[in-house]
């Protein structure tokens, strides 16, 4: 039981770090097109939905971010951030 709580805490910490990266480096970056910032906000909302298990929240966010990851209007630095976030989300089980 204690191990389970520690694992959940680590997963929640990882999710919070991912939310922080999305918020600071995508949502608040005015050089990023509005549709991409909106998708990042939707991914953040999906990650913050405590009614679902962490793996389901991560899968929801992955689906949203993968859809916009190939947008030709996305700045290269933002695309790199999105790919890094996707990699981190894929590790959440």
Curated annotation (Swiss-Prot):
HAMAP family: UPF0147. It comes from the Archaea. It comes from Pyrococcus furiosus (strain ATCC 43587 / DSM 3638 / JCM 8422 / Vc1). This is UPF0147 protein PF0239. Coiled coil: none annotated. InterPro entries: Ta0600-like_sf, UPF0147. Belongs to the UPF0147 family. It holds the Pfam family UPF0147.
